[in-house]
Amino acid sequence: ANPIKVHGLILRTGLIQKLSNGNSIQVLFSPRLMTDFRNIDSRHFQFGGTFIYKKVYHKRLKIGYGILYNQETFGPNVVPLVNLEWKISERWSMSGLLPIYSKVKYKVNEKLNVGIHHFGLVTSYRLGEETYQNDYIERRSIDLGLFARYNIVGGIHIEGRYGYSFGRSYSQYNQDDKIDLALPLATIRDNRTQLNESSNFSNGAYAHVRLVY
């Protein structure tokens, strides 16, 4: 069979309400199209969002507490969140939406930042290809690596990343093979049967370059 190519398009919209004490409430709605772009129907769409209450501890430290919910193809996915903005010094800072992603950044000069980053989030993709039309793919990976971001002009940056992916898998399941609940370190009533056990991915290096605005 031909290789399966999956894609994700995510729209984020919502509101941020500033409070009188300087803290804020953020509510985001995040519909997703997670698909192989074959025979797309309503089952290729997912709906979810995040809620975060952000507290200002001082001008260099803001921490938000919240939750992410998304209705994945395999069932509901719930992730407790910690949103961090910490300016450690004039050159060092740390930011992220833990446990999904984070960055430790060093400011080399006004245009160049370098540092360490991580990204880890379970995602799922509905398949429309006729051979696999009743199946979905569940992707798992934790990416850890180095990055460099350069400001080209205005708010446009170019960023390069190089690192290593741990626990990488693209597991294939039947559309009716679901779980009751997914959490960051556990799944509730997960009795699924993987359909592609012979094609498991191994850990490995990754590298990519992207434009950021």
List PLM regions with ranges.
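Outer-membrane beta-barrel proteins
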Residues: 1, 36-40, 74-77, 123-129, ...
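Extracellular loop and loop/strand-boundary signature of outer-membrane beta-barrel proteins
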Residues: 1, 34-39, 68-70, 89, ...
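Flexible, surface-exposed loop regions and adjacent strand-edge segments
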Residues: 2-3, 43-47, 80-85, 131-135, ...
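Residues that define the transmembrane beta-barrel architecture of outer-membrane proteins
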Residues: 3-9, 41-47, 76-80, 98, ...
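Outer-membrane beta-barrel strand-turn architecture
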Residues: 17-21, 55-59, 88-90, 108-110, ...
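Repeated loop/turn-to-beta-strand initiation elements of outer-membrane beta-barrel proteins
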Residues: 22-27, 59-64, 91-94, 111-114, ...
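Transmembrane beta-strands of outer-membrane beta-barrel pores
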Residues: 31-37, 67-73, 88, 100, ...
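Outer-membrane beta-barrel "beta-signal"
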Residues: 81-85, 148, 154, 199-213
